[in-house]
Amino acid sequence: MSSSQSLRLGVNVDHVATIRNARGGDRPDVVRIALAAIAAGADGITAHLREDRRHIRDSDMARLKAEIEKPLNFEMAATAEMQGIALATQPHAVCLVPERREELTTEGGLDAAGQYNALAPFIAKLNDAGIRVSLFIAADPRQIEAAAKLRAPVIEIHTGGWCDAVVEGDSGKADAEWRRIVEGAALARSVGLEVHAGHGLDYATAETIAALPEITELNIGYFMMGEALLVGIAETVRTMRAAMDRGRATLKTRTA
């Protein structure tokens, strides 16, 4: 596990595939964008193979695994089909997420506590295969404690509620959501979990959350793909990396 001083950037390439699939064919190339992001400083690539294949395809996952040299984080629902694909692909990590066909994006965290009995053998099989398992959950003590009992080594805190409140200018809700994240990250580390965060992050919120010492990785996609349309993927990655570094630098100042 990385030290608390380091912070990795995982770039989610799902919406490269969304643009590609709007017209069909193979352009823009998901793997080409992933390689460009890595060349610009991304520490890993995240891709979500949904059950309905609305953006990432099975062939994208296979190519990403074969062609990128940085860690591949395979987001997926906890289904037998996806488990089989993950075991065949052997990504660095799997992040288990809830999934509903009618949603536009992942709307909430996984109910690790409520689905404990189903998730326990599912996670154990991935662990036994040498795949790191992450659970995408809300910063809820009940869910965090369930993740630890399930022997998932990593959680990814769902930051969507906080990010949405920040963008909407709802300071009361933003403050409440932020407190949940801060307290959740501290609890997760105290029970031995590695803590990642993602969903809805932009330059400003990434800089803010980078100052939390418990967080070791941010996974960011939609915002970065939108920025890349304006300035290119390399410049977007460099700007995001700089924002994260500024946030992390405040941690070093506090602990100096």
From Swiss-Prot:
Record: active site: 48, 75, 199
Please give one Pfam family short name: PdxJ
Where are the bilayer-spanning segments? none
Q: Name one GO molecular function term.
A: pyridoxine 5'-phosphate synthase activity
Q: Which pathway does the protein contribute to? A: Cofactor biosynthesis; pyridoxine 5'-phosphate biosynthesis; pyridoxine 5'-phosphate from D-erythrose 4-phosphate: step 5/5
* Subcellular location field: Cytoplasm
Q: Which residues bind 3-amino-2-oxopropyl phosphate?
A: 12, 23, 200, 221-222
Q: Where does 1-deoxy-D-xylulose 5-phosphate bind?
A: 14-15, 50, 55, 105
- Give the GO terms filed under biological process for this record: pyridoxine biosynthetic process
What do the Gene Ontology cellular component annotations say?
A: cytosol
- What Enzyme Commission number(s) appear in the record? 2.6.99.2
Catalysed reactions listed for this entry: 3-amino-2-oxopropyl phosphate + 1-deoxy-D-xylulose 5-phosphate = pyridoxine 5'-phosphate + phosphate + 2 H2O + H(+)
Q: What class of enzyme is it?
A: transferase
InterPro entries xref list: Aldolase_TIM (IPR013785), PyrdxlP_synth_PdxJ (IPR004569), Pyridoxine-5'_phos_synth (IPR036130)
Q: Which domain of life is it from?
A: Bacteria
- Site Transition state stabilizer: give positions: 156
**Which keywords, in A-to-Z order, does the entry hold?**
Cytoplasm, Pyridoxine biosynthesis, Transferase
CDD domains linked to this entry: PNPsynthase
Q: Does the keyword Signal apply?
A: no
Provide the assembly information: Homooctamer; tetramer of dimers.
Q: Which family does it belong to?
A: Belongs to the PNP synthase family.
- Note the NCBIfam families from the entry: pdxJ (TIGR00559), PRK05265.1-2 (NF003624), PRK05265.1-3 (NF003625), PRK05265.1-5 (NF003627)
Functionally, this protein is described as follows: Catalyzes the complicated ring closure reaction between the two acyclic compounds 1-deoxy-D-xylulose-5-phosphate (DXP) and 3-amino-2-oxopropyl phosphate (1-amino-acetone-3-phosphate or AAP) to form pyridoxine 5'-phosphate (PNP) and inorganic phosphate.
* Protein name (Swiss-Prot/TrEMBL): Pyridoxine 5'-phosphate synthase
State the organism of origin. Answer: Nitrobacter winogradskyi (strain ATCC 25391 / DSM 10237 / CIP 104748 / NCIMB 11846 / Nb-255)
